[in-house]
Amino acid sequence: MGCCGCSEGCGSGCGGCGSGCGGCGSGCGGCGSSCCVPVCCCKPVCCCVPACSCSSCGSCGGSKGGCGSCGGSKGGCGSCGGSKGGCGSCGCSQCSCYKPCCCSSGCGSSCCQSSCCKPCCCQSSCCKPCCCSSGCGSSCCQSSCCNPCCSQSSCCVPVCCQCKI
C-alpha cells in the first residue's frame, strides 16, 4: 500500500514512480495507491511522484503545505529522494523542499542547511525571503530577514541587515 510501490493498481498513472521514489515508501502516512497518481500527492510526507497538480490537492483528501504557491505542477520530486519532512511550513515550491526543512523551529546558534527551501537565516522566522543579503544600504529591512540583525543606528527599523565587521 505504499505510495511509491506502484503495485497497487496505479497503472499508467504511475508516471515513473518506481525507482525515483527514494525513501518515501514506509513514510507515506496512509496515502495508499492514490499517491502514485501524478495529480494526487497531497500528504506532507508522500511526494515522490513526478508531479502534483496544486489545483487538485483538495480532492486528494490531504494537505501538501506550500502547494498553493507553486502555481502549477511540481516536477522532479522523485529525484529529491525521501519525504517532505517539516518543509511544508516553509511554504516552499522547489524540489529541494523535499529534504528536511532547516529552520522549522529556529536556527539557534547554527546556520541552516543548504537544502532549505528558502535562504538561510539565524532567527526563529526562518525560511522566509532574505531582505538584505548585500547589506543595509538605503532600503528598509524586513523582520524576517535571514541575516543577523544590525546594531548600527543607520540601519532601518526593524533592524535586520548583515552588518559589516
UniProtKB/Swiss-Prot annotation:
Repeat (Sequence) residue spans along the chain: 35-38, 41-44, 47-50, 116-119, 126-129, 145-148, 155-158
One cellular-component annotation, GO: intermediate filament
Keyword terms: Keratin, Repeat
Keyword Repeat in annotation: yes
Region listing for 7 X 4 AA repeats of C-C-X-P, in residue ranges: 35-158
Tissue: Expressed in hair root but not in skin.
Family named by the database record: Belongs to the KRTAP type 5 family.
Protein task: In the hair cortex, hair keratin intermediate filaments are embedded in an interfilamentous matrix, consisting of hair keratin-associated protein (KRTAP), which are essential for the formation of a rigid and resistant hair shaft through their extensive disulfide bond cross-linking with abundant cysteine residues of hair keratins. The matrix proteins include the high-sulfur and high-glycine-tyrosine keratins.
Record's subunit section: Interacts with hair keratins.
Name listed for the protein in its UniProt record: Keratin-associated protein 5-7
Organism this protein belongs to: Homo sapiens
